[in-house]
């Protein structure tokens, strides 16, 4: 693997979902302009972290992989800028809901989905009210800039996450 420039982004999300997506896009553009090739956005960046409460109205925020406007928008952005974007979103798949991540390659191709395996349930983290445990297994993707693997948030506390990704040949976690 050659040299890879990675950028991370973070911003305060509001219930103005279009504004959140615009902010995320602007941060991706800024990072790409500074030479970043792999740009990470925060978990569930389209909305505030709604899992602090139990309210099933939030289920309406979920989007299916094949029709997700978020994924389409940011895959097109990845292509325009020639960058790789791991994209966290609230996924609806059939009758199940997941905290998921899709990777948009530098040519705009969506390479597939990873669904968060370890779902926390504690004060301020009511994720089991919204998300099923992932059913994809840990994923590694061949991208324009190397083999990347990803866990989502709580997954990091479990050593098998990194071990499984490394055994699959991930060069970057």
Roles of regions detected by a PLM:
Residues 63, 92-172:
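Active-site catalytic loop in hydrolytic enzyme cores
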Residues 10-17:
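Short polar catalytic/cofactor-binding loops
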Residues 8, 41, 153:
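Generic enzyme active-site microenvironment
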Residues 1-6:
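Extreme N-terminal starter segment of soluble prokaryotic enzymes
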Residues 19-30, 156-165:
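Short, acidic/polar
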Residues 7, 84-86, 149, 173:
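Structural detector of well-ordered beta-strand residues that form the stable sheet scaffold
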Residues 11, 44, 155-156:
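Active-site metal-binding loops of divalent metal-dependent hydrolases
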Residues 17, 26-107, 113:
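Cys-nucleophile CN-hydrolase/nitrilase-fold catalytic domain and related Cys-dependent amidase chemistry
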